[in-house]
Amino acid sequence: MEEHRKLLPNATVEEYNYFEEDFVFQGLSWKKRQEFAEDTSFLSPFDKALQSKWEEKMNEGLFRYPLRNVQTKILPGSVSYVAQLNIQRSINRRKPEDIWSVQQKFNPNQFNYNKIKSEEIVFQMIRSEAEHSVDSHIVQGSMVNGMGSSECKSGSTPQGSCTLECKSSCTLVVINVSPLEFGHVLFMPDPSLCLPQILTENLMLFGMESVFLSSHPGFRVGFNSLGGFASVNHLHLHGFYLDHELLIESSCSKPLCPEINFHLVTHFPAPGFLFYTDGKDLKSTAQKICKVTDFLVAKNIAHNLFVTRGSNPDTGKVSEDRNGIRVIIWARKPSFGAKEVSAFNVALCELAGHLPVKNQEDFISITEDSVIAIIHSCLLADDEFTQLSLDLVQHLRKQ
């Protein structure tokens, strides 16, 4: 497994320590965001660190293509889809791995994140329980050498993966070299664990924490399962900025298990399962989310997940409030061996209302009706979705 040795022979990586007191619980509304316009003073320390490092990597030419001022338009209609022209991604992105099962095991012979260049790493993030001190966020010189190990250590903690011990709270932040939007990164646990693309509680918890670390209402996090257009079978989340409001942030929902904030998104083209949290119960929310995704994996049901600032669905009305976050899970038809024939692939972004379009012709002609038709073709049949909803409610109510 020589490839593993080539990756990061004692690479030095910046460490970003964060604390619970860094979480931004009073979220910025989109109205307030628009008032700031180009003024970035509202950004949190996390936003500033991530954006500056990402732009630095872009200026160094580490991406497959430059991403500047993505051509964007809002489609007329009730959903207000955000369509963006991204021709270079469809041309230059890495060929996706062959996927045939949601439960597919990690294959070290396929491309995986043990093979990335050390320069692609932004920093590693560690949640600290220590007392917050001035300038304690970034610490230079943490060594990440376990990623260069000669074998996968799935199921065990790798020795030396971080000099300061890469515990479950240590997450690597890596640029997506084929970016969808500004600040597009991948969040992953220690790659030498060689975990397949099946969501874990620790990574889900980190994904929600990262949204609370950001003061930008447009910072999003997401997950594509195998069969849900995940292109690499190596555990990771996506994180990126989309500086446009999405309907999914405030769309109406129907309570399924109100006692655990589990809802069904309604009045939206892609019905999905919704969890809401104000940030006070992140660990238990991560457990419930993974109870759903584990159920889907066991049934070999492909799925996508989207994390965003959003309003509390319990209020029963549309609100500008963005103090909490919504986590939406879509069960869908699998894309095993599917050919990419539509204007866009239906994955986490598209289901949420963000459409990276592959070519100029489709970008010009695309309409809300055509988008909804493509999305509906990827969803479960109504009777199958109804039965799944009943099964999940029963499953979640089990102790």
UniProtKB/Swiss-Prot annotation:
Entry keyword Oxidoreductase: no
GO cellular component, one term: cytoplasm
Compartment(s): Cytoplasm
Keyword Nucleotide-binding appears in the UniProt entry: yes
Entry EC number(s): 2.7.7.78
Catalytic activity: GDP-alpha-D-glucose + phosphate = alpha-D-glucose 1-phosphate + GDP + H(+)
Annotated GO biological process: glucose metabolic process
GO molecular function, one term: hydrolase activity
Active-site residues, Swiss-Prot/TrEMBL: 236 (tele-gmp-histidine intermediate)
InterPro entries reported in the protein's UniProt record: GDPGP
Keyword field: Cytoplasm, Guanine-nucleotide releasing factor, Hydrolase, Nucleotide-binding, Nucleotidyltransferase, Transferase
Major localization listed first in the record, in broad terms: cytoplasm
UniProt function note: Specific and highly efficient GDP-D-glucose phosphorylase regulating the levels of GDP-D-glucose in cells.
UniProt similarity note: Belongs to the GDPGP1 family.
The name this protein goes by in its record: GDP-D-glucose phosphorylase 1
Organism: Xenopus tropicalis (Western clawed frog)
Gene that this polypeptide is encoded by: gdpgp1
